[in-house]
Amino acid sequence: FFSALKTSGIRKDHQLIVYDGMGLFSSPRVWWLFKLMGHDKVAVLDGGLPKWIDEGRPITDRAEPGETFVGKPYLQNHLIADFDKVFVSVREQNFEIIDARSVGRFNGKEPEPRSGLRCGHIPGSRNIPFRKVLNEDNTLRDSCQIEEIFRSAEIDLRKPLITTCGSGVTAAVLNLALSRIGYNNHSLYDGSWAEWGGRLSAPVAVGAD
């Protein structure tokens, strides 16, 4: 990621706005990556390119040439969780783990799209499919709605949170939603189910709990 920045023309003092072609899907992951690298001046375009086009706003097919990036990343380790951190948290129950995958994949009743992965979820984790925090037009729900979604899932917001999904992409949608409600004690399990489900040493739960 940092290697790509070197020819991007992005500077540390730039205010960044990231977007994707699906509304809110991969852009929160990019937002999180910039945060992880210590670039705080980054926001997500709500609704992405589809909403921008629907509103009749200007678009172009030209890309501005980039300049050499000057600077270095300052990794914000509190924003990322690795396998060991999640493994310990399952035993000690000192984090809330939230899974952004679909209900069927979480319960282990739908096959995983990646071959060789077990079905189910991390024991003790809760399920909030990422689309639940989005409106029909793929914009982020308002703060009150998001808070109610997390409360309905019995998430204890007094604990630090770890988000997870299939590969670490849509989990970032939940991180973005948490930031919208002013809750900042959250990290993202980068390996997500692609790592957890592929490790035979990792415990797996099936069903709704």
What role is predicted for each listed range?
Residues 126-135, 193-194, 198-199:
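Short, flexible loop segments at boundaries between secondary-structure elements
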Residues 49-122, 200-209:
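Active-site neighborhoods of enzymes that stabilize oxyanions during catalysis
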Residues 184-209:
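Cysteine-dependent PTP/DSP-like catalytic domain, specifically the C-terminal lobe
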Residues 1-15, 128-161:
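Helix-loop module immediately N-terminal to the HCX5R catalytic loop
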Residues 165:
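Short cysteine clusters
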